[in-house]
Amino acid sequence: MKNIRNFCIIAHIDHGKSTLADRLLEATGTISGKASQDQLLDNMDLERERGITIKSHAIQMRYTFKGTDYVLNLIDTPGHVDFSYEVSRSIAACEGALLVIDASQGIEAQTISNLYLALEHDLTIIPVLNKIDLPGAMPEEVKDQIVDLLGCDREDIIPASAKQGIGIEDILQAIIERISPPTGLVDAPLQAMIFDSVYNSFKGVEVYFRIFNGTIKQGDQVKFVNTGKSYEADEIGVLRLGQIPQESLSAGYVGYLISGIKNAREVKVGDTITHVNNPCKEAIKGFEDVKPMVYAGIYPVESNEYEELRTAIEKLQLNDASLVWTHESSAALGIGFRCGFLGMLHMEIVQERLEREFDMTVITTVPSVQFHVIDKQGDLHEVNAPSELPDPNLIDEIQEPFIRAQIITKPEFIGNIIKLCVDKRGALQNQTYLTPERVELTFKLPLAEVVFDFFDKLKTISKGYASLDYELLGFEASKLVKLDILLNEEKIDALSAIVHRDKAYELGKKLCAKLKELLPKQMFEIPIQAAIGTKVIARETIKAMRKNVIAKCYGGDISRKRKLLEKQKKGKKRMRQIGSVEVPQEAFLAVLKLE
């Protein structure tokens, strides 16, 4: 066991984490230079294309140092804020971490939040200054930032360039010398933590785990503590480039388990694996059920594709256990699904995977967050969609989720960023200068304002120099109302939204004006109204198309003309009572893009 090292790589998006992993694999001979492709561990096309890591991955390397053979287990972590729970579980499975920082970008928000996670788990941190070969690199300044942040010596920082292969041997040496080997008892009851799972259509769910205590053998009866289900370990082994089956694995090892599990929901990241007959005393701390933050409706474009969409979502869920869904029907869009996501990036990825892997075109409705409604009896209801909101007379208060957002940026953009956050009902809580060129701003913001277009706007006003990280603070009461849109005095449920009372009037006005542009004219006039409850707060009218009925009247007799006009008016009135308005799809999509 003293020759095992478990480590992960912490970095902000684009700081070169996946490339560094590729170089380490080449240096240890795990892959030959020929067989390699870039971002080897990112095995979804989407991950390679966007250059982000979505799932956690693990791989075992062998390295000989001063005549001793060492086993190095690299556990790759996602870097995006939506996947922070997966990161925390990957970190908990390690004893050390490489903190990779881009020499041209410096320290970013995500780097700091993941670093704090690593320090909470008492990991040994090895700072690596990456991309020193870039013309825009500022190695000395960034070294100062790292020293300020970690309180380490300048000599501890390893300069490297993953692309050129500089400094790779130094990193491997540091992993062996600085990171402590795993501790744990081989003879104790089995205690292992799941940090990831992958769905394989032939073998079922493959579970990736790290053993803290005990030994697992092939054919053992094991159970997952939090779900309480038990399985037989059909196949266990270690992960190199492929899977290598083993007879048994003991404390300190990272491995995989296959036992024909068909449902991905039974495997929860962070759960504890133990033996059925000799269970461990307690589960590993830190397990949480991941709760979705953002909800949106997903509907098929053609209503006859409903079944196909359902199969597609079910298959996606096998690989992505954090996606939750229920059935939902809407008068305007037909039948579809209400899906819960970890955040906006997760939502985009799910949508893109549906289009890519299953060839489905879908409409997504306005994303919203979960609200808590407390009724007059004092009971709490969870509301995931505006249509679920109870009658206003029954509501005592509505609570919405608040987040603490940390934004790191350059000093010249502070004014614009504060203005953006205040417009989004945020409050500035703290402002610290990390270096003269980098400021950390802490805001308290309602999540509902952030899920929409906050990130895009933040990037725009800071010319791309701001990075964001957030965590949920909890629910607080707010003045929220349900804004309905009425067309020809009928509610259009897909356009309803739960908004803050102070913003309702402005939003209602914009929505009505936008719909007036988008809806085609009819033979009768259509009122477009925005209403809160029964009170209309904004209105636009689409004028009717009318035929000139008095064109054939020559001579001046006004009563003849009036008779024809009255007759036309009556016809229009009758039409309006029975006429219904089709809402084109562009209208729904345009509402998403309201400024």
Swiss-Prot record:
Membrane topology note: Peripheral membrane protein
Cell compartments where the protein resides: Cell inner membrane
Binding locations of GTP: 14-19, 130-133
Keywords: Cell inner membrane, Cell membrane, GTP-binding, Hydrolase, Membrane, Nucleotide-binding, Protein biosynthesis
Any single GO CC term annotated in Swiss-Prot or TrEMBL for this entry: plasma membrane
GO MF term (any one): GTPase activity
Catalytic activity entry: GTP + H2O = GDP + phosphate + H(+)
Metal-binding in keyword set: no
Domain called tr-type G: residue spans: 2-183
Family: Belongs to the TRAFAC class translation factor GTPase superfamily. Classic translation factor GTPase family. LepA subfamily.
Biological role: Required for accurate and efficient protein synthesis under certain stress conditions. May act as a fidelity factor of the translation reaction, by catalyzing a one-codon backward translocation of tRNAs on improperly translocated ribosomes. Back-translocation proceeds from a post-translocation (POST) complex to a pre-translocation (PRE) complex, thus giving elongation factor G a second chance to translocate the tRNAs correctly. Binds to ribosomes in a GTP-dependent manner.
Name of the protein described by the UniProt record: Elongation factor 4
Underlying gene: lepA
